[in-house]
């Protein structure tokens, strides 16, 4: 049993290869999927060379196909630096990477870094909305969360998680995640990279700011007030050895001092819960720090800056 997902599993390997080839063959016409080698291989003795073999089996099975698919590898819970990545793997997925250090540690790979499972942090929508925005604006490429609003009794996703479930989920959260999707797709995000030095000063104590930018052209800025170790809706540290991630709901106002190349820009503050435009201003940058005052907000807010 301990060698099921190793290259020492005897005749089982041929069955696994045949299964992979069958799946790849059946799905070859679909362009809305990628293949992940194995979920959470770090639990249960899944050998790295077996994972590489499965990736190579997918590549070989698709070699004659007109439409080829990306291959993902699930690396770790949390964040770690990837050593010796396999060339067939295009997406490196992490679970519970909050804060999103997995992106920073592996940015140099020039590959997609994903957060493809998060949960176990209570059921508040704000927690998973903030984790999603934080990861994507840090430069991440994939986000999804455990969603316990879908059950046998509520296949439409309207169940209200009762606290016994290790995560949240709701129609409201999914609407909020669409705001993130629409926000990031409003950019040529492939041309953007993390540029947190754009913010010269102004980030409040206890807040986090992310900047994704195509310098001189497009800037996506995100500010939030969430972190592990705080009781929900308070600033009281939790004694829990794996403290829940939670978001302060206190009223906030932020003035960022941003350094932009000389030119004319438009800055738009956006409500991450509704997508509503809260404030717009035009500015002319001299290349020195320029003050951008947010409207009042709670939990988090996004700022879109684009050259005019």
Residue ranges: model-predicted function:
Residues 41-43, 75-79, 89, 100-131, ...:
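Active-site clefts of carbohydrate-active enzymes
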Residues 128-281, 293-308:
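Aromatic- and carboxylate-lined catalytic core of secreted/periplasmic carbohydrate-active enzymes
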Residues 85-92, 108-114, 136-143:
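Glycine-enriched alpha-helix->loop->beta-strand junction motifs that scaffold or abut catalytic
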Residues 35-37, 71-73, 92-94, 113-116, ...:
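Hydrophobic faces of well-ordered beta-strands that scaffold small-molecule active sites
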Residues 1-89, 100:
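Active-site mouth of glycoside hydrolases
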Residues 288-290:
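Short strand-edge motifs at loop-to-beta-strand transitions and within beta-strands
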């Amino acid at each position: 049993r301990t060698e099921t997902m190793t290259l020492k599993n005897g005749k089982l390997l041929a069955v696994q290869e045949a299964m992979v080839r069958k799946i790849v063959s059946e799905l070859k016409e679909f362009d809305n999927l990628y293949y992940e080698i194995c979920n959470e291989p770090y639990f249960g003795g899944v050998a790295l060379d077996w994972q590489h073999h499965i990736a190579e089996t997918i590549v070989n099975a698709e070699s004659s196909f007109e439409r080829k698919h990306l291959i993902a590898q699930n690396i770790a819970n949390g964040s770690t630096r990837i050593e010796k990545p396999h060339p067939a793997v295009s997406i490196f997925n992490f679970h519970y990477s909050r804060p999103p250090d997995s992106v920073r540690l592996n940015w140099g790979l020039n590959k997609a870094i994903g957060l493809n499972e998060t949960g176990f942090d209570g059921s508040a929508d704000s927690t998973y909305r903030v984790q999603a925005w934080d990861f994507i604006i840090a430069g991440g490429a994939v986000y999804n969360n455990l969603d316990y609003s879908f059950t046998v009794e509520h296949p439409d996703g309207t169940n209200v998680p009762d606290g016994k479930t290790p995560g949240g989920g709701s129609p409201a959260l999914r609407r909020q995640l669409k705001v993130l999707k629409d926000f990031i797709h409003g950019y040529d995000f492939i041309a953007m990279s993390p540029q947190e030095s754009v913010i010269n000063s102004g980030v409040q104590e206890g807040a986090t700011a992310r900047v994704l930018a195509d310098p001189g052209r497009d800037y996506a800025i995100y500010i939030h007030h969430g972190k592990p170790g705080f009781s929900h809706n308070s600033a009281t540290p939790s004694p829990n050895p794996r403290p829940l991630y939670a978001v302060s709901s206190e009223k906030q106002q932020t003035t960022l001092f941003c350094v932009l190349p000389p030119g004319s820009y438009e800055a738009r503050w956006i409500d991450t819960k509704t997508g509503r435009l809260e404030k717009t201003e035009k500015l002319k940058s001299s290349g020195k720090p320029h003050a951008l005052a947010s409207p009042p907000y709670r939990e988090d807010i996004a700022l879109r800056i684009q050259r005019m």
